[in-house]
From Swiss-Prot:
Residues that span the membrane, as ranges: 702-722, 726-746
Region (Disordered): 1-21
Record-listed GTP binding positions: G67, S68, Q69, S70, T71, G72, K73, S74
Record protein name field: Protein SEY1
Entry GO terms, CC: endoplasmic reticulum membrane
Origin species: Candida tropicalis (strain ATCC MYA-3404 / T1)
Function: Cooperates with the reticulon proteins and tubule-shaping DP1 family proteins to generate and maintain the structure of the tubular endoplasmic reticulum network. Has GTPase activity, which is required for its function in ER organization.
Family in the record: Belongs to the TRAFAC class dynamin-like GTPase superfamily. GB1/RHD3 GTPase family. RHD3 subfamily.
UniProt topological domain (Cytoplasmic) ranges: 1-701, 747-808
Topology versus the membrane: Multi-pass membrane protein
Length: 808
């Protein structure tokens, strides 16, 4: 401490109740930052700027000392940090330090002498506890200890060795109260900001005699701190926080200052080494991470919060007056705001410019708050800020009305476009595309509404929640549509392929026909099931996917049933039987038309043809497998409830039809089968008669002797042909044609064709002649019938046929 400073120019006692004035010559002296009247000194920053090097910035450390009165706290600081805190007059034990003092440490005592720290060290000397001067009044002790704990990086707890393990002697009661209040005031910041800030509790054990190891003393004291922390009354949300989340603990022992002065000095120097040489005790998480001027402001705010905390003090009359006046100002300012608000936002814009609206929001709110600040800032700061928050809430509520209106309009417009976009997907990459569209929609709306949200004060969470629900409804409905579309397309594809398979099998039915058709059906069904494997790529639930597969299964079996009945109706069955009959009856194995020369051949072929046709009748009237079992669907397609569920078909006569038995495998009923057989027999019998008639006509031929007569009588004509070149050429061509037909084995078919052509020509000639000569066919037919002795009531058609047969 400078020897040039005179007694009259300085206050060398920390017990002074007035603030020490800052003077350029007092660079090593302390400044009282909190006096006995609990007032914070506003000159602290000025003191630091004059005592510490320029541009301190963040390069500083704050160390404070805490402990019982007259335990040598100030002496420890002076010896270690070379400060000038007043110490106790050993001839008279009384309180020396009053309030809280702050001093700049120019150098630190180390084993190598006085060492300058790389960082600027500021030391706080806190008024001792348990002093007789304050007696039972522990209010300032609690507040001073709490202040030191809240503003320091390292809190030195100065105790004697004999105090370790004691409760009151080690100030455990006071520490518990201080920790409890510190937790309630500053604990929430650790949750809200995820703050990892800690304070190092450096326990300096004084008058250490060396009998008990320091490690044992440290273990005892640390366990006492942990037990004390566990017994704290913590807020519910802070119950999980541990002592180690807030504090680190370290220990250092010092010998007796009077009895062992050399060892005491060595202990001081070793502690200095730990601070500045090894940089062992300062850690980044202890620092408050604010510049020195910010720390001064922080310290002032901390003291104000500690001093005015409701748990420690009651509202004063000044606060009550401030509350009344601030409420009055809020009401006046808000009414003025409402007038401007109505002028600006009374009528909504048809095509809103959200950026412009957001700017109007901000300007109007800032003007309103500025009016309030001018009138209310002179009152109690806490009340002023509280009522300012209330005014902001009132203003934001009015803005929220406009915000909600435009949010609703914007959401409605965007949802319509979203719906159109979702429908346009047509199931292509549906789940991924819908996710992209919905994410883009919400992001677009949030971005747009962010322009009128007053920098996020007006939350769009309600809008996005409702929007997400609407999006989910749209997507859910479209999912059902797309799911049904996929099922219907799959059923349609299966139906087409199955129909082709059935048609192919109808070309040549056999006992394995339905095995082949069923195998094709199962293959097509399995192809669909394998393709989707329970997931249709629509983002639908497992339950919806299962229902879709059940619907596909029901519709596929229904399609199987309908395809069989569509392709094998009784009309088509009759045509099929006729075609099979004709294949054998009219054509040979080479596909050439047959010419019957005798009735025996005709009857044999007729029997074979009819058997060939009727062989497939049992196969095509009921769907049976080669093992004789009928095809049975895996699901009852005739169940009325299932038909209504999967097909939307409500059978009105379902109650009347409950007793009817439906057989999936039955394609043609027995009655229909009888009708088909009757018609088939009639048709084939007609073909048989027609063919037999042509044989009879063919057999009736000219006698052979007639040809001799023709040769004899037509010899002259024959010679005339030979002598005529034209006629001779025609005769050669005719002979060559007959020879070629003979060699190609086509002579008989050619004769048949010629004969039938001639017969048809004659028949047509007779018909035309009859139409000319006879006007009333039926009358003439009856007359002819009477002449022939027929029944007059017989149909005219029968008589007409008889006439034709007789004529032929």
């Amino acid at each position: 401490m400078s020897s040039e400073l005179s007694e009259g120019e300085l206050s060398h006692t920390s017990s002074s109740s007035s603030f020490v004035p800052v003077d350029q010559r007092q660079l090593q002296d302390a400044i009282q930052i909190i006096n006995e009247e609990k007032r914070f000194n506003q000159s602290v920053l000025e003191y630091i700027n004059k005592t510490a090097p320029a541009d301190v910035g963040n390069n500083y450390h704050i160390i404070s000392v805490f402990g019982s009165q007259s335990t040598g706290k100030s002496t420890l600081l002076n010896k270690l940090f070379n400060t000038n805190f007043d110490v106790m007059d050993e001839s008279n034990r009384q309180q020396t330090t009053k309030g809280i003092w702050l001093a700049f440490s120019p150098v630190v005592s180390t084993t190598s002498g006085h060492t300058s720290s790389k960082s600027n060290i500021l030391v706080m000397d806190v008024e001792g506890t348990d002093g007789r001067e304050r007696g039972e009044d522990q209010d300032f002790e609690r507040k001073a200890a709490l202040f030191a704990l809240s503003t320091s990086e390292i809190l030195i707890i100065n105790i004697w060795e004999t105090q370790v393990g004691l409760y009151q002697g080690a100030n455990m009661g006071l520490l518990k109260t201080v920790f409890e209040v510190n937790l309630s005031l500053f604990g929430k910041s650790k949750l809200e900001k995820h703050d990892d800030h800690k304070v190092l509790l450096l326990i300096v054990i004084r008058d250490y005699v060396g009998v008990t190891p320091v490690e044992s003393l440290a273990k005892t004291f640390t366990q006492d701190l942990i037990n004390m922390w566990a017994s704290l009354a913590k807020p519910a949300e802070l119950e999980h926080l541990q002592f180690a989340d807030f504090f680190d603990v370290d220990f250092h022992a010092l010998n007796h200052k009077v009895l062992q002065p050399k060892e005491f000095s060595e202990g001081i120097n070793k502690l200095g080494d730990r601070l500045v040489v090894g940089d062992e005790l300062f850690k980044p998480e202890y620092h408050h991470q604010v510049p020195i001027d910010g720390w001064v402001m922080y310290a002032g705010n901390c003291w104000e919060q500690i001093e005015t905390n409701k748990d420690l003090d009651l509202p004063t009359q000044q606060i009550l007056v401030a509350q009344f006046k601030c409420d009055e100002i809020v009401e006046n300012v808000f009414q003025e705001f409402l007038k401007k608000f109505e002028q600006l936002f009374g009528e909504p814009q048809a095509e809103p410019d959200y950026e412009q609206i957001g700017a109007l929001f901000s300007d109007l709110r800032n003007d309103t708050l500025e009016d309030y600040d001018i009138s209310a800032s002179k009152y109690n700061k806490s009340v002023y800020e509280q009522k300012r928050v209330k005014l902001i809430s009132l203003v934001n509520e009015k803005f929220k009305e406009v915000f909600d209106f435009y949010a609703k309009e914007l959401s409605s417009t965007m949802l319509k476009k979203f719906h159109s976009d979702v429908v346009a997907l047509k199931g292509k990459n549906f789940a991924a595309s819908v996710k992209e569209l919905s994410t883009g929609l919400i992001a677009s709306i949030v971005t747009t509404l962010g322009l009128i949200s007053l920098q996020g004060d007006l939350s769009s969470n309600e809008v996005t929640t409702a929007l997400s629900k609407d999006i989910a409804d749209i997507v859910s409905k479209q999912q059902v549509i797309e799911l049904n579309s996929i099922v219907n397309r799959a059923v349609k594809k299966l139906t087409n392929s199955l129909s082709k398979s059935i048609q192919f099998e109808l070309g040549d039915p056999n006992e394995n026909t339905w095995d082949t058709v069923l195998q094709q059906f199962n293959s097509l069904s399995q192809e669909v099931l394998t393709k989707y494997d329970g997931d249709f790529g629509l983002g639908t639930t497992d339950e919806q996917n299962k229902q879709a597969l059940d619907r596909f299964q029901f519709k596929s079996w229904t399609s199987f049933y309908e395809s069989m009945h569509k392709l094998i109706s009784k009309e088509k069955l009759l045509v099929l039987l006729q075609d099979r009959f004709d294949d054998v009856f009219r054509y040979d194995e080479n596909g050439l038309p047959k010419l019957y020369l005798n009735e025996a051949d005709l009857e044999k072929t007729f029997t074979e043809s009819k058997q060939h046709a009727l062989k497939v009748l049992p196969i095509l009237t009921i769907a049976k497998l080669s093992d004789g079992s009928e095809i049975v669907p895996e699901i009852d397609i005739f169940d009325h409830k299932l038909r209504e569920k999967y097909l939307g078909v409500a059978d009105e006569d379902s109650d009347d039809e409950d007793d009817d038995e439906h057989c999936f495998a039955e394609i043609v009923t027995e009655q229909e089968k009888s009708e088909v057989l009757a018609k088939f027999k009639k048709e084939v019998d007609a073909k048989y008669i027609e063919t037999k008639r042509s044989i009879v006509q063919h057999i009736t031929q000219i006698p052979y002797y007639i040809y001799l007569v023709i040769v004899f009588l037509g010899w002259n004509e024959f010679m005339a042909i030979i002598r005529n070149p034209l006629l001779f050429s025609l005769a050669l061509l005719l002979g060559a044609s007959v020879y070629i037909l003979y060699k190609l084995n086509l002579l008989k078919p050619a004769i048949v064709v010629a004969q039938r052509t001639f017969d048809e020509t004659v028949a047509m000639g007779k018909e035309k002649l009859r139409e000319i000569l006879i006007d009333d066919h039926e009358t003439q037919g009856r007359n002819l019938g009477k002449i022939a002795g027929k029944n007059p009531s017989a149909p005219a058609e029968e008589y007409s046929d008889n006439i034709e047969l007789d004529d032929m």
